[in-house]
Amino acid sequence: MSGWPRIYYKLLNLPLSILVKSKSIPAEPAQELGLDTSRPIMYVLPYNSKADLLTLRAQCLAHDLPDPLEPLEIDGALLPRYVFIHGGPRVFTYYTPKEESVKLFHDYLDLHRSNPALDVQMVPVSVMFGRAPGREKGEDNPPLRMLNGVQKFFAISWLGRDSFVRFSPSVSLRRMADEHGTDKIIAQKLARVARMHFARQRLAAVGPRLPARQDLFNKLLASKAIARAVEDEARSKKISHEKAQQNAIALMEEIAANFSYEMIRLTDRILGFTWNRLYQGINVHNAERVRQLAHDGHEIVYVPCHRSHMDYLLLSYVLYHQGLVPPHIAAGINLNFWPAGPIFRRLGAFFIRRTFKGNKLYSTVFREYLGELFSRGYSVEYFVEGGRSRTGRLLDPKTGTLSMTIQAMLRGGTRPITLVPIYIGYEHVMEVGTYAKELRGATKEKESLPQMLKGLSKLRNLGQGYVNFGEPMPLMTYLNQHVPEWRESIDPIEAIRPAWLTPTVNSIAADLMVRINNAGAANAMNLCCTALLASRQRSLTREQLTEQLDCYLDLMRNVPYSTDSTVPAASAGELIAHALQMNKFEVEKDTIGDIIILPREQAVLMTYYRNNIAHMLIMPSLMAAIITQHRRISRDALQQHVEALYPMLKAELFLRWEREELASVIDALASEMQRQGLITLQDDELHINPTHSRTLQLLAAGARETLQRYAITFWLLSANPSINRSTLEKESRTVAQRLSVLHGINAPEFFDKAVFSSLVLTLRDEGYISDTGDAEPAETMKIYQMLADLITSDVRLTIESATQGE
């Protein structure tokens, strides 16, 4: 580029460099989209805009991509490196590819015909200033909105800092030429497909139009389901029809979101400022799969785990910065207090009560509102656990909202609904101190403005945050595979509850929890906490801690828990240095070196972070525990031990493997442990390697408390085979609390009611006990003996004497 064009673009770039601060999506386009910078690259933009072109240029130069203003020279021919699909509103008033774009596509394809070695990468790019979806009334702009010069100036002036450049996966023009030819008709089709691509992309980024709130209420009131529920309300409560209708409107006011794009923009600015000061980074993985779902027109339901009230804000912030529409979020009614409630409502929150029981009108209004969100194409987010995890582990899922999601499908909607599991991880959770108190029996504080301000005042040095998108679950595909007859239950009016609904919902919920855990994120904090809590004195030398972290990291990298889980790329030493900056640990120096200590008052709180990744290390920990206690054991015996205990572990920690996969998992982990020198293999027997026994023992300690808990329940069951389920749960907790005091176990989840409830249900499902309470003493004693060999003798004596004393 030379002469007047260069001067023109430089002059135009002066105001743009001041007004525009755009983001690239994805953050590293060349790396994440697999662009090969050694091959020619051309850019395709939706319509003619020099401002868009210069904004794209700034991002290309920032990411070491070819300059779009520099033409491509191919076989002596100079061709523009960019193509505008449409000329813009100054010339055309309807969508057809501009002839020039068709000509350029044809020129590029023709070069591929004459040069078999040529392969140009065509990269569609859309530049967006602002993300306002608009309201359903009074706006006529089409989904792919074009602005004339004056409109563009005001858009850039007002929204220049709320802009992004979205790079799409490249298309190989070589493949296009080989498969479809190079004539002008193919060039026209290519332009038409590109135009459709951009229209879809804009809809995915902006979302459907927002309804006027009163219009939405009127539509809901007119629905047959709510009209019938209003009549039932009037009849059952002996009130007038108008009064019953007012009750329904009041419920809509209580439930419905009041989405505001301006509030999203303002909050994005505030959160961007806040995150940069509180967090050292927000790590996002696998967002491209969600962008693709949105582009393909899926109705997306985000299903994250629930660690903190921060989850609401963090996930919406991440989605917004990934070029996606912030979802409508199901929030607990406890958050509907001033001023948080009105703010959350404008950010997309709709409020849900803890229980629907005994209020048919409420359940009908909520179900119809949720169905309306789906039918209009809004993405939705809800926490399938029902509440925040107090232990750091996933809670058993609550299936009410998930059931309503499937019922919405049974209304006969056309858009495919896809569930997207999400793992959210933190290096610091602001409520963790409160969680520990609640697990010890303290009453949960009601959310309020003073409590919110108190929590905000404590926010500092939060380390890293992690948002990992798991494997999506298309509901239609799932139902087609597991309930082929599901379409027979479609009813556009009534909320249908076919016989297959409850077991199917339970199965989907369990699968979602597994997929959330599959996307787990190891980090400096949870790895250091795991190692230090494994030490009985909660302290290790820096060298020992480094060695232990190396063990964990090698296990996770060389035998990954799943393809969606993430492990830090940093070294053990770098992770320890980062964790020490979090001010959770103490360092004592002596003449030999550093000793890193987890203070007693912090130990209980740090179990929360250890539990975040317990599922990722439980299998190698269990194997290490078995090998350590037996000193040497055959592969077959090791597998028998693991298979006997695995059903309980799978249910408790939502592990991913089926029983038939265990042999290959054990082999892979054993090979890695042998490679690390933790064990040796002699005549198909696994032996402890004495030179690395400390590392193996610390690894084994990760399963210690779980095995002790199982030993308690199996001993009680063996000692009293006729014990009923509720008594078994209660007595197991009592013994666990006693064990916790006598042996200094600082893990609040050790005697958590939910953990023992889940365990007893699994024992029923596995046939150890029946609904009537009768157990098979020979089988339970066999498992107890196995567990007794894996725990220390003093713990075993405490368990057995506790029941004898009664």
Curated annotation (Swiss-Prot):
GO terms for cellular component: plasma membrane. Keywords: Acyltransferase, Cell inner membrane, Cell membrane, Lipid biosynthesis, Lipid metabolism, Membrane, Phospholipid biosynthesis, Phospholipid metabolism, Transferase. It is found in: Cell inner membrane. GO terms for biological process: CDP-diacylglycerol biosynthetic process; fatty acid metabolic process; phospholipid biosynthetic process. Its EC number is 2.3.1.15. A motif (HXXXXD motif) lies at residues 306-311. Disulfide bonds: none annotated. It catalyses: sn-glycerol 3-phosphate + an acyl-CoA = a 1-acyl-sn-glycero-3-phosphate + CoA. One of its GO terms (molecular function) is glycerol-3-phosphate O-acyltransferase activity. The keyword Cell inner membrane applies. It is an enzyme of class 2 (transferase). It holds the Pfam family GPAT_C. It is a peripheral membrane protein. It comes from the Bacteria. The HXXXXD motif is essential for acyltransferase activity and may constitute the binding site for the phosphate moiety of the glycerol-3-phosphate. NCBIfam families: plsB (TIGR03703), PRK04974.1 (NF003441). Belongs to the GPAT/DAPAT family. This is Glycerol-3-phosphate acyltransferase. It comes from Salmonella typhimurium (strain LT2 / SGSC1412 / ATCC 700720).
